């Protein structure tokens, strides 16, 4: 256990991007809505509610984990559906990188209705260096050209190099409901997109049609009892994918069974104690995100109060349940009134599958070991992505206190550290419910994480 505690203390604030103003001054369009490392970890992409995608590149000239601005482009624009009289937001719901096959980068981005495949590449800009109209070679006062030696043919010179982005494909008009997930297959040729009631299978090179592989829409919408909340392909087996539902279950599908995957090959469901059921039970059991482990052996699911780790070979119960917000059970009525109970927190595995990460309120996020021999509250650490990290880093030379980590679920005994990465007691009366960590991504090969905190992107690392 000492080794675990030593490793927890190594986490430190590395970087922060974004406006450092007060929360009250934040523009809605600047709020980050998606974060994703690429398959190498050298590039990091974020999407925001203004429809923009910003890319960062690893700065290898610096020690530790540090990124620099790479490029930015407008991915989606606001639209209007005249048939349904609905506005379609430009907000980026998900970003997924495609595996790199040449010098160009490819990534998928989606809003509620339209998915786009973007190509990003280095483009040389050239300018005309000289010709006979150039002031240095000819003017009206010199008269007409009389000899061939006076002729100056236009010549192009290298002027600058930019990162160009253009939509290679646009996959539109395939979803009647809001898209909540996209996932690229391990075959690097296909991907899925999921909305509330359907999942479609696409070929990356074909944008005008897709195959509907899951459809849970009842004939009578009054009989609707659940919606799809998240979907993902298996990281190794290209025939397997899973999706989660608002009923709190996860269904594993095999594309080889049938064209329409109505019957899952496995159903993962944690049976709730009937005596503890309440009005809020169905809401808090709704799964907001699911992820496969890197080796495909385990599944991580996040509902409002817990993280659960499932073995794909064991459907009856999770191998580990990690309580996150038990102190909020007494506040569920208030959280229902202010809609916080419907917040959709994401979750992710570490690159080595030894830890998992998910967010909380007051800009807290937790890192937890996956070892099922440890109790759910053992060996965990809670960090805070806050602007105090800036101020602390600038005053690091002035005896900044050591990073404090929450161990063994001792929430209230730890003071807040000046590094901005300390535990903050999860007293439900003192939590800031406007500051929440909904989106995060873990570097594929090292212990570095990217955290979206409102309009700021934080990077924490052990390096």
Swiss-Prot record:
The keyword Phosphoprotein applies. SUPFAM superfamilies: WD40 repeat-like. PROSITE patterns: PR55_1 (PS01024), PR55_2 (PS01025), WD_REPEATS_1 (PS00678). WD repeats lie at residues 27-66, 87-128, 174-212, 223-263, 282-320, 337-378. The modification Phosphoserine is found at residue 134. One of its GO terms (cellular component) is cytosol. GO terms for biological process: negative regulation of G2/M transition of mitotic cell cycle; negative regulation of induction of conjugation with cellular fusion; negative regulation of septation initiation signaling. Keywords: Phosphoprotein, Repeat, WD repeat. GO terms for molecular function: protein phosphatase activator activity. Belongs to the phosphatase 2A regulatory subunit B family. PP2A exists in several trimeric forms, all of which consist of a core composed of a catalytic subunit associated with a 65 kDa (PR65) (Subunit A) and a 55 kDa (PR55) (Subunit B) regulatory subunit. Phosphatase 2A affects a variety of biological processes in the cell such as transcription, cell cycle progression and cellular morphogenesis, and provides an initial identification of critical substrates for this phosphatase. The regulatory subunit may direct the catalytic subunit to distinct, albeit overlapping, subsets of substrates. This is Protein phosphatase PP2A regulatory subunit B. It comes from Schizosaccharomyces pombe (strain 972 / ATCC 24843) (Fission yeast). The lineage of its organism: Eukaryota, Fungi, Dikarya, Ascomycota, Taphrinomycotina. The gene is pab1.
């Amino acid at each position: 256990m000492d080794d675990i505690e030593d490793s927890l203390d190594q986490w430190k604030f590395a970087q922060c991007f974004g406006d450092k103003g007060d929360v009250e001054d934040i523009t809605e369009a600047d709020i980050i809505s998606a974060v994703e490392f690429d398959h190498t970890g050298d590039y990091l992409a974020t999407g925001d509610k203004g429809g923009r995608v910003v890319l960062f590149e690893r700065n290898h000239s610096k020690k530790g984990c540090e990124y620099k601005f790479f490029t930015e482009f407008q991915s989606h624009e606001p639209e209007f559906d005249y048939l349904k009289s609905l506005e379609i937001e430009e907000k980026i719901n998900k970003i997924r990188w495609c595996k790199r096959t040449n010098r160009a980068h490819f990534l998928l981005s989606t809003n509620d209705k339209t998915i786009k495949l973007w190509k990003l590449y280095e483009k040389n800009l050239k300018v005309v260096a000289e010709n006979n109209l150039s002031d240095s070679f000819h003017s009206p006062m010199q008269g007409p050209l009389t000899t061939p030696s006076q002729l100056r043919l236009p010549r192009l010179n290298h002027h600058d190099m930019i990162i160009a982005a253009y939509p290679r494909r646009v996959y539109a008009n395939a979803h009647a409901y809001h898209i909540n997930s996209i996932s690229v297959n391990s075959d690097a040729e296909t991907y899925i997109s999921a909305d509330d009631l359907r999942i479609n299978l696409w070929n990356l090179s074909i944008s005008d049609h897709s195959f509907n592989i899951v459809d849970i829409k009842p004939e009578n919408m009054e009989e609707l009892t659940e919606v799809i909340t998240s979907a993902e392909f298996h990281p190794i087996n290209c025939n397997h994918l899973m999706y989660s539902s608002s009923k709190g279950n996860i269904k594993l599908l095999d594309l080889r069974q049938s064209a329409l995957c109505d019957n899952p090959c496995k159903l993962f469901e944690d049976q709730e104690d009937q005596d503890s059921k309440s009005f809020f039970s169905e809401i808090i059991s709704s799964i907001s995100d699911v992820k496969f482990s890197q080796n495909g052996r385990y599944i991580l699911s996040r509902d409002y109060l817990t993280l659960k780790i499932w073995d794909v070979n064991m459907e009856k119960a999770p191998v580990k349940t990690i309580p996150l917000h038990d102190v909020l059970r007494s506040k569920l009525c208030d959280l229902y009134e202010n809609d916080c109970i419907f917040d959709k927190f994401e979750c992710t595995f570490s690159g080595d599958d030894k830890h998992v990460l998910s967010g909380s309120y007051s800009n807290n996020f937790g890192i937890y070991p996956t070892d099922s021999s440890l109790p759910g509250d053992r060996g965990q650490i809670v960090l805070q992505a806050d602007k105090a990290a800036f101020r602390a880093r600038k005053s690091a030379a002035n005896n900044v206190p050591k990073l404090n980590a929450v161990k063994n679920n001792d929430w209230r005994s730890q003071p807040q550290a000046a590094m901005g990465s300390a535990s903050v007691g999860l007293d439900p009366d003192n939590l800031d419910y406007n500051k929440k960590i909904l989106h995060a991504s873990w570097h594929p090969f090292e212990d570095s994480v990217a955290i979206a905190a409102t309009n700021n992107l934080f990077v924490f690392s052990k390096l």
